From Swiss-Prot:
GO terms of molecular function: amyloid-beta binding; G protein-coupled receptor binding
Protein name per UniProt: G-protein coupled receptor-associated sorting protein 2
Stretches with biased composition (Basic residues): 255-271
The organism of origin for this protein: Homo sapiens
Sequence similarity: Belongs to the GPRASP family.
InterPro entries reported for this sequence: ARM-like, ARM-rpt_dom, ARM-type_fold, GASP1-3
Length: 838
């Protein structure tokens, strides 16, 4: 049966596709679109694929229904016989692969139900698979056997040493032997090589199977099916798998290695639609897609759809290109032809090879593995071919040819070809990897991507991809300038919005200036009437509305920051202007920083790296907000003096001595903790300084803030007499701070006795006069309210049973009389007419 020849009439006549070429052979172009060309030898076209309806002889794969012979892979349902792989349901006799139900006798494949006797094929079902698939012309050529017979004989001819010719060995035994035994060392190579003889593209059919198999399947097919599903095709693709199309061992390995390097089965065959081979590049798109590539009956074109070219007809062009390439020893074309072979197209590409040198491509591939030089020479073509095989799954049925064409015609599009082969439906990752490595030394990375990038997904290449994200500048130009028209005309008008950055040297102007509302400007320009009597520098702390706490920042605006140049200009303008007419609420004016002091401040900050001191500098520059106490402390001590003191810098400033003494004081009270010792020292230093001096004022302000909690009230109350004396001798501003401190103490019943002593009450009552500031009077009234609340609550009796209310009661009565008189005086001042009438 192995030697039996299939009659030309027995071969099914696939429909002739437009552009399909008929190869010189026993079959005519019209009758058999897949013509076998005696390209190489009469060896069985193991691994050949029928174009569409053609049945595959050993190593041939039917596109859809054909059964697989040994070395051929059934699509899905075929059962594996010795050396054969069942597609799914069909049972295969050794060397044969049934697609569905048909059983193949040795070397013969039935399309559907028909059973093929080895070497014999039903006319309709057994299309000259040899011819259609691989252009079995090689087989008939070598043996003089009809192409049909050549195809029929098993793949067993592999290097097992029994290279059966079309008539040689029985299909069954050969196939079985080939799968199990003949290919032990070189799984794919031996079985397929017999086809075209050593060095030839014998593997073309076998490795060309469109449907990729699970690696398990690989084992069955005459060694072509490597464990990784390299099968003829797979072996070709798998790393060192034997020749893809029953090539000579070296050549086969070369190709397979070449591809296997990066792709296990880069384009061995797509499992589903994508399996179409580029090889089927006959003029008819349908042939190329249906015949052998798509065992499932899908168009090979999808698989091979070139990413760049998606024209179905391309493959015809490609075929020509491939042929040229094969002749020029381009592995790519060879691959395309070898694995894409639809009947005629396979022949055509083989023909070209035969004409030029069918073995050339195979050798080239084999040599490539062996010889890196060859690999470099042919890499692009081969990659292109590979791309066709894996890249385009389900794109166009007619693309099978197109993909092939791309591979051939565009050696530069290596990644395209490789992408296609590696990309296929389920085996994309494995397919792409093998093909790329060898084919493209330059674009190896590009080729490889196809194999690993998409898992079970179609490749989709966009020539003009949109960026995933738009890159935008993260930083604004520091040198960006504001338009002169948008700049504030006066300092009262606007301040620049705070922008974090260096606090000296280079300032960062705000790019979004904002104008202060008119109400705010009016308040900045003129203080309310009721603030006229306020002590200097304490206007914001006025108690005009005792029920509402004063805001931390005027108008609740964020701190503003100006550049160094702007601050210099502003300070010079303030010095040149009259102090009475100058009104500004900026931090520099609040801290009373002069031009000379500001320059010293900048010099210090250039030399200092202490983070704590930098925080102070940020406050002075307006870059950082600060509490009122902190601002007052910096203002009273002087920003430069404060920094020098903290750094132990020598300074000639008089006011620095206070800070030095305060910071470097000796703890005279061993029984007190550090903070308590510090508070006692501050009280002593404050009272020791001259009245109304800056050092004294600074100490009082510090104590005022320390009395916000009751923890230190008792300590400070010990110095009550000294602070009460200041209420009689100090100016309005010093009185204000002393009264604010005493107001905090008045809330604590524990110190009420000392605070409201007879001496204290007389001093408080003496403050009710027309000459005293309204703020100070308001504070005294608030103090009496606090003590009144303490007495009413009964807390006073619990703390001190000896506390006498008589002095307080008399003080309250006197206080009421003074309050009425004071109110009358104020009313008379506000309404002169009423004063005259009275």
């Amino acid at each position: 049966m192995t030697g039996a020849e299939i009659e030309p009439s027995a071969q099914a006549k696939p429909e002739k596709k437009a552009g399909e070429e008929v190869i010189a052979g026993p079959e005519r172009e019209n009758d058999v679109p897949l013509v076998v060309r005696p390209k190489v030898r009469t060896q069985a076209t193991t691994g050949a694929r029928p174009k569409t309806e053609t049945k595959s002889v050993p190593a041939a794969r039917p596109k859809t229904e054909a059964q697989a012979m040994s070395g051929a892979r059934p699509k899905t349902e075929v059962q594996v016989m010795g050396g054969a792989r069942p597609k799914t349901e069909a049972q295969g006799i050794t060397g044969a692969r049934p697609k569905t139900d048909a059983r193949a006798v040795g070397g013969a494949r039935s399309k559907t139900d028909a059973k093929a006797i080895p070497g014999a094929r039903p006319k309709d079902e057994a299309q000259a698979w040899a011819q259609s698939e691989f252009g079995t012309e090689a087989v008939s050529q070598a043996e003089g056997v009809s192409q049909t017979n050549a195809v029929a004989w098993p793949l067993a001819t592999a290097e097992s040493g029994s290279v059966t010719k079309s008539k040689g060995l029985s299909m069954d035994r050969e196939l079985v032997n080939v799968d199990a035994e003949t290919f032990p060392g070189t799984q794919g190579q031996k079985g397929i090589q017999p086809w075209f003889g050593p060095g030839e593209e014998t593997n073309m059919g076998s490795w060309c199977y469109s449907r990729p198999r699970a690696r398990e399947e690989a084992s069955n097919e005459s060694g072509f099916w490597s464990a990784d599903e390299t099968s003829t095709a797979s072996s070709f693709w798998t790393g060192e798998e034997t020749s893809v199309r029953s090539w000579p061992r070296e050549e086969s390995n070369t190709r397979s290695r070449h591809r296997a390097k990066h792709q296990t089965n880069p384009r061995s065959r797509p499992r589903s639609k994508q399996e179409a081979y580029v090889d089927s590049w006959s003029g008819s798109e349908d042939e190329a897609s249906n015949p052998f590539s798509f065992w499932v009956g899908e168009n090979t074109n999808n698989l091979f759809r070139p990413r760049v070219r998606e024209e179905a007809n391309i493959r015809s062009k490609l075929r020509t290109n491939r042929e040229d390439c094969f002749e020029s020893e381009s592995e790519d074309e060879f691959y395309k032809q070898s694995w894409v072979l639809p009947g005629e197209e396979a022949n055509s590409r083989f023909r070209h090879r035969d004409k030029e040198d069918p073995n050339t491509a195979l050798k080239l591939r084999a040599q490539k593995d062996v010889d890196s030089d060859r690999v470099k020479q042919e890499p692009r073509f081969e990659e292109e071919v590979i791309i066709g095989s894996w890249f385009w799954a389900e794109k166009e049925a007619s693309l099978e040819g197109g993909a092939s064409a791309i591979c051939e015609s565009e050696p530069g599009t290596e990644e395209g070809a490789i992408g296609g082969s590696a990309y296929w439906a389920e085996e994309k990752s494995s397919l792409g990897a093998v093909a790329r490595e060898e084919a493209k030394p330059e674009s190896e990375e590009e080729a490889i991507f196809g194999s690993w990038f998409w898992d079970r997904d179609e490749a989709c290449f966009d020539l003009n991809p949109c960026p995933v994200y738009k890159v935008s500048d993260r930083f604004r130009d520091a040198a960006e300038e504001l338009n002169a028209s948008s700049r504030p005309q006066t300092w009262d008008e606007v301040t620049v919005e705070f922008k974090p950055g260096l606090f000296h040297g280079v300032g960062f102007r705000s790019t979004s200036p904002f104008g202060i509302p008119e109400e705010a400007s009016e308040m900045l320009e003129a203080k309310p009437k009721n603030l006229e009597l306020s002590p200097e520098g304490e206007e914001q702390e006025s108690l005009l509305q005792p029920d509402q706490p004063s805001p931390e920042f005027t108008f609740q605006y964020d701190p503003s920051y100006r550049s160094v140049r702007e601050i210099r200009e502003h300070l010079r303008a303030r010095e040149s202007a009259e102090s009475e007419s100058w009104s500004c609420s900026c931090i520099q004016c609040e801290l009373k920083i002069g031009s000379e002091e500001f320059e010293e401040f900048l010099l210090l900050m250039d030399k200092i790296r202490d983070p704590f001191i930098h925080e102070i500098s940020k406050i002075a520059m307006g870059m950082r907000s600060a509490s009122q106490f902190t601002r007052d402390f910096i203002r009273d001590s002087g920003v430069v003096s404060l920094i020098e003191t903290l750094l132990n810098y020598p300074s000639s400033r008089v006011r620095t001595s206070f800070l030095e003494n305060m910071i470097h004081m000796a703890p005279p009270y061993p029984n007190l903790n550090m903070i308590e010792t510090f508070i006692c020292q501050v009280c002593e230093e404050t009272l020791a300084h001259s009245v109304d001096s800056l050092e004294q004022l600074t100490g009082i302000r510090m104590l005022r803030h320390l009395t916000m909690t009751i923890d230190y009230h008792t300590l400070i109350a010990n110095y009550m007499s000294g602070f009460l004396s200041l209420l009689t001798t100090a100016n309005a501003r010093t009185k204000f701070h002393v009264l604010k401190m005493l107001l905090n103490l008045s809330e604590n019943p524990a110190v009420a006795k000392k605070l409201f002593s007879a001496k204290a009450l007389s001093i408080f009552v003496g403050l009710f006069n027309i000459e005293e500031t309204n703020d100070n009077i308001q504070i005294v009234i608030k103090m009496f309210q606090n003590i009144s609340n303490i007495i009413k609550s009964g807390k006073m009796s619990l703390i001190d049973d000896d506390f006498s209310l008589e002095p307080l009661i008399s003080a309250f009565r006197e206080f009421e009389e003074l309050a009425k008189q004071l109110q009358a005086q104020i009313d008379n001042q506000n309404d002169p007419e009423v004063g005259q009438q009275s």
